[in-house]
Regions:
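Non-catalytic signal-transmission and effector/linker regions of two-component phosphorelay proteins
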Residues: 1-5, 109-112
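Short secondary-structure boundary/capping segments
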Residues: 3-5, 13, 68, 90
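Polar low-complexity intrinsically disordered regions enriched in Ser/Thr and small residues
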Residues: 11, 64, 106-110
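STAS-typified acidic loop motif
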Residues: 5-31
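Short acidic-hydrophobic, aromatic-tinged amphipathic segments that line or gate anion-handling sites
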Residues: 99-103, 107
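Short histidine
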Residues: 16, 34, 107
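Amphipathic alpha-helical interaction surfaces in cytosolic regulatory modules
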Residues: 21-98
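Residues that form or immediately flank small-molecule/cofactor binding pockets and catalytic motifs
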Residues: 8-10, 83, 105
Length: 112
């Protein structure tokens, strides 16, 4: 799973560069996310999912596992959810667990 990270003063933005997070890639995604978040001290971690067209239950579980792996003082936020991925979060009520930003990371400059 290819992920690209960009760190600012108080936010680490991680962009998923594949079109799906599923059973075949969930473990690799989770391990890479833990590596990237472990190398950062930013209190906010934003996962840009704008290129993710498909997310199955394994992928959703991997995103939740990343959230649980962060220190209690850090937040995992999501951005750029496609309609299909947004539906998965809504149907599973995970949209109440995560802060979800509309659009991509450009809109995060003004997000609080």
């Amino acid at each position: 799973m290819e992920l690209v990270a960009q760190e600012g003063a108080d936010v680490l933005v991680i962009r998923a560069m594949r079109d799906r997070i599923d059973a075949a890639s969930a473990i690799q995604f989770k391990d890479k996310m833990r590596e990237l978040t472990g190398n950062s001290v930013a209190p906010r971690v934003v996962l840009d999912m704008s290129s993710i067209a498909f997310l199955d239950s394994s992928g959703l579980g991997a995103v939740v596992a990343v959230l649980k792996s962060l220190a209690p003082t850090r937040k995992l936020e999501l951005s750029g959810l496609t309609p299909t991925v947004q539906k998965v979060f809504r149907l599973t009520r995970m949209d109440s667990i995560f802060v979800i930003h509309d659009g991509g990371p450009d809109g995060l400059r003004h997000a609080g």
